[in-house]
Amino acid sequence: MFSRSVAQTPKWMAPKEADDLKNPLVANSHILAAGKALYTANCGPCHGDKGRGDGPAAAGLNPKPADHTSAFVQNESDGSLFWKITEGRTPMPSYKKTFTDEQRWEIVTYIRSLAKPGKKK
């Protein structure tokens, strides 16, 4: 019998001060549609259209893309998610110069809509 161990990628943590960033947007159909469009076009290739980290480009990435439906992601602050989208890390690009603040908050708002039942903050 052989045993296999799977290396766990350390969780990506935003700096504590990111928690102080507050989402100025209120989720509504317009904000969610805008966030979904941005997410699908820019985040979907790696994170997947449903946010599970299983997009077509995910297989070759290290670290693997986050599952945005997971309790870990859904329990992060909005500010933490905004910071990660803004700053990026290898292999995820920074979107600081690609999207406006409002567009990044739209993506955060959309990520919240991906929560599995019972996993929302």
Regions found by a protein language model. Give the residues of each.
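Short glycine/proline- and charge-enriched loop/turn segments
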Residues: 16-20, 60-67, 89
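Sequence/structural segment immediately N-terminal to covalent heme-attachment motifs in c-type
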Residues: 29-52, 58, 81-87
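Extracytoplasmic/secreted proteins, especially bacterial periplasmic and envelope-associated proteins
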Residues: 20, 30, 34, 38, ...
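Electrostatic cytochrome c docking/interface patches
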Residues: 9-38, 121
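C-terminal capping alpha-helices of c-type cytochrome domains
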Residues: 9, 83-89, 96-121
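Conserved beta-strand positions that form and line the central face of beta-propeller blades
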Residues: 24-25, 50, 67, 91-94
